[in-house]
Amino acid sequence: DDLSDFNPKV
C-alpha cells in the first residue's frame, strides 16, 4: 500500500 510510506509497518 502507498499508505505504508505514511504508516511504515515495522
Curated annotation (Swiss-Prot):
The keyword Secreted applies. The keyword Secreted applies. Its main location: secreted. Expressed by the venom gland. One of its GO terms (cellular component) is extracellular region. Keywords: Secreted. It is found in: Secreted. Belongs to the SA81-like family. Negative results: does not show activity on voltage-gated sodium channels, potassium channels, and calcium channels. All the following channels have been tested at 10 uM: Kv1.1/KCNA1, Kv1.2/KCNA2, Kv1.3/KCNA3, Kv1.4/KCNA4, Kv1.5/KCNA5, Kv1.6/KCNA6, Kv2.1/KCNB1, Kv3.1/KCNC1, Kv4.2/KCND2, Kv4.3/KCND3, Shaker IR, and Kv11.1/KCNH2/ERG1, as well as Nav1.2/SCN2A, Nav1.4/SCN4A, Nav1.5/SCN5A, Nav1.6/SCN8A, Nav1.8/SCN10A, and DmNav1, and the nicotinic acetylcholine receptor alpha-7 (CHRNA7). This is Venom peptide Sh41.
